[in-house]
Structure formats: structure tokens, C-alpha cells
Amino acid sequence: MASTSDIRNGLCIKFNHDIYKIIEFLHVKPGKGPAFVRTKLKSLTSGKVLDNTFSAGHKIDVIRVETHTFQFLYPEGDEFHFMNAETFEQISLNKNILDAPDLLKEGTNVMVQINTETDLPLSVDMPASVILEVTYAEPGVKGNTATNATKNATVETGANVNVPLFINEGDKIKIDTASGSYMERVKE
């Protein structure tokens, strides 16, 4: 058992008969009253995000996890297949456990957290950004550049992304996996 002073981002805990990953936390010590910790928890079984407040010194049940590098192989319905980069063992994960399944390209390396007690995958950390090719881009209308004008584009994985007007089919773009937004055009 750990206490609230051990809370950090990425920590996996057992709480309310479910397994959660701490996304954000803030230690608060008000002028009046006891200290507490505000947390944002993501359920690793359902993917729902929950706000919770722990009082200072509250005991939390930490789950031991190991992190391994896996390579994305292919999607099959709601299942996504990965291969361990070290042991070449293959696993399939439901798309609910992934943050941005529509941005996964074959060969992308991800970090998978595995519960050491049950050997079940808990969560998948995507790379911070991915580089994908634009397969379809709406034509940009000239004269609409007074403000930050954007248009819809489809990338090779099938995801839709808002991009600036100068992006055309065949361009490679860098996409932020956390927000799914356009970052920059990549020159080869």
C-alpha cells in the first residue's frame, strides 16, 4: 500500500473495484483545512475518465506494471494485433485500450504496460507524434487565407485531420497523437 504522497502521472492503481491510470494530479494544501490530492483517473477497462479527490495520507493500492515495446501489426475488427519487439510474442488488444487507434500505422512502436500479477495488458502509450501521408485533401479555396483557415484531410490510416490550406494529397504530415491535431508538414 502506498499513500497519496506517492501519486505521480502514469501510476496504475486499484480503486473502486477497477484499475485506473493517473493522468493528472495536483497536491493542494489550503490555508484552512487538511491537504488533499486532486486526480484525474482513466479506467483501463472502460476508458472513462474520472475526477477524484484523495485526502492527504489516504492509502492507495498500487499495481505493479512492466513496460514493453510492441510493434503494431494489423487491425482486425475491434482488435489490434501487436508483436513484442524482444520476444516476438503476439498479442491482440481491444481498441478501447488505445488512445488514438485511428492513427496507428503498421510498424509503429508503442509502449504496453502489463500487470505483473495477471500478465494482462493494462494500457498502451502511443508515440508523441506520428508521420502519415495524406491520401485525400479537400481543395483549398484561394482568398480564404485572412485567418487560420483549415480544411479536412484523410491520412493513410483513414483518420480525418484538419490541416492548413497548403497541404495537398501525397504530402506527409506530423500529427500529435494526444489531440489528433496537425503539427507540421514533413519534408523528405
Swiss-Prot record:
Pathway it works in: Protein biosynthesis; polypeptide chain elongation
Keyword Repeat on entry: no
Cellular compartment(s): Cytoplasm
GO CC annotation: cytoplasm
Biological processes per GO annotation: peptide biosynthetic process
Major subcellular site: cytoplasm
Keywords: Cytoplasm, Elongation factor, Protein biosynthesis
Keyword Cytoplasm among record annotations: yes
GO molecular function annotations of the record: translation elongation factor activity
Functional note: Involved in peptide bond synthesis. Stimulates efficient translation and peptide-bond synthesis on native or reconstituted 70S ribosomes in vitro. Probably functions indirectly by altering the affinity of the ribosome for aminoacyl-tRNA, thus increasing their reactivity as acceptors for peptidyl transferase.
Family: Belongs to the elongation factor P family.
NCBIfam families in alphabetical order: efp (TIGR00038), PRK00529.1 (NF001810)
HAMAP family: EF_P
Name under which the protein is recorded: Elongation factor P
Lineage, uppermost ranks: Bacteria, Pseudomonadati, Bacteroidota, Flavobacteriia, Flavobacteriales
Gene that encodes it: efp
